[in-house]
Structure formats: structure tokens, C-alpha cells
Amino acid sequence: MLTCYSGLAQQDAQYTQYMYNTININPAYAGSRGVMSIFGLHRTQWVGIEGAPTTNAFSLNTPINNSNLGVGLSFVNDKIGPTNDNTISADVSYTVQMSETYKLSFGVKGSGNFFSLDKGKLNPQVAADNHLQDVNSDFSPNLGAGIYLHSDKLYLGMSVPNFLQDKKYNDNQYAVFQERMNFYFIGGYVFDISPSIKFKPAFLTKVVTGSPLQVDASANFLFFDKLMLGGAYRWDAAVSALAGFQVTDGLFIGYSYDMETTKLRHYSSGSHEVFLRFELFNKVSKMVSPRFF
């Protein structure tokens, strides 16, 4: 009897501190901070569960001087169980000055995805299946796009990083991994509570066909333009604590801890995420106060 293996795993890598890592999901963000921004992140998800996701992300984006263009490069490595997913992306954005306050950016993303399966990590009975003998690695290109409205206090965005719905191992009728489009909607607003305290509520909504709706809501405080503290809630999934510190004008570090609210909490001690953002300022763009996203 023939058996067809069909899978739909976690699609794009998951982030709790998405508000600082927007370039990975929305190409229109490229250059929007007005400086060269270098970002690195590591996430260990569901600690204590064997084969749980681990993610490493790196990105660089910058505006092009004397133009409305921005460019970006990013790399994401996402490991889940026996799978290893590497994505390299290039982003280009074009920004229109809508008013003295608001800018609207349009972006496109081109990416290449390298997906591999380590059969040595599979159950021996599964790994020995003749139908999986030709399954090792796969490469697929993709295209994405996004829009991003922003000011010094507000941002709203909509994006689809992966328009092409590729089937991994399509030449093997017994082992099919179907990618799906991920639709992202993000937003946030910064309120000045006092000269030394800022408050920013924010949200991210991710829509994937055939998967539950993901809604992340967060609330963060920034004290003296230095210390960030906050919390977040992922609908029916997790609650999070967030912290960050502006070490210098150009260096910002952050950490978040997720505690599961599902049955996974009985098997996992939570998820950890750390990031570092380094920015290079020129004489014109010298930072007066840090932008809170």
C-alpha cells in the first residue's frame, strides 16, 4: 500500500520582538529609519522540547543618499526538528513624502530559500522508507511586497513576503511540503506620557491559509530614551516579557521571554529571544532621540 506524506509546518520564522525586526517581513521598511541599521537576533523556542524551532536572523538596511530609495539584505536560518531552512533576501523600497508628518513606502523583496532534511534525525523506521530516499534538499526562489506608512510616532504596514506557493520535493509524489503565503498586518503608536516616559502599544496579525489566525499585541514603555520594558500576548499561544536598553546612540540590545499558555507549557520552560541593533549615523541624521520602532 502506498502512503502519501503531506506536511504543513510553521511557515515564516516566528518573532516576539517583530517591531524591531520589520525588514524580515516587510520590504518597505528598508531605509525607513534614515540610517544604516544592522540587526542580529537569536531565538530558542519551546526550551525542553526536542526538535523545537531555533532561529538566527541577520539583516542590514539603509537609505540611499539623495534619493527616495532604500535597500536591504537579510539572512534567516530556521531549524525545526530534522529540517534546516535558510533564506537570503534582498529588499528595495521607494518612499513618498505624504505630508510634513507622514511617509509612505513601497517595497519589493526577492529571496532564495534553501531547505534541507536531515534523515539521520528521523525515526529509523521513517528514515528507511523507500519513498524518502531521494529527499535531501531543495532550492526555491520567491517574491514579496509590502507597504509601510510611518511617522516619528506611528507606523502601519501590510506585506506578503512570499507570493510563490512552492511545493518542496514536488518530484516525489510521496513527500510533499506545501508552502503558503503569509499575510502580515502591523501597527503601533507612540504616546508621550511625560518628557521622560513614552508608551507604545503595537500589534501584528499573521494570516496563513489553512492555519489559525495569529494575533500578537504588545505594550512597551521607554524610560529616559534608554530603558524599554513591556509585555506582549500572542492570542491562544503565549504571554511575553520584553526588555531593552539603548547602550549608546547607535547600539540597542533587547531580550524577550515567552511563556506558553497552551498544553506545551507542561513540557517546555518557555522561549528566549535576544537581539542587537547597531546603527551608523552621519552628520545630517545624527540621532536626537531614539525612534521607538
Predicted regions and their residues:
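N-terminal signal peptide c-region/cleavage motif recognized by signal peptidases
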Residues: 4-6
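Subset of outer-membrane beta-barrel
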Residues: 10-293
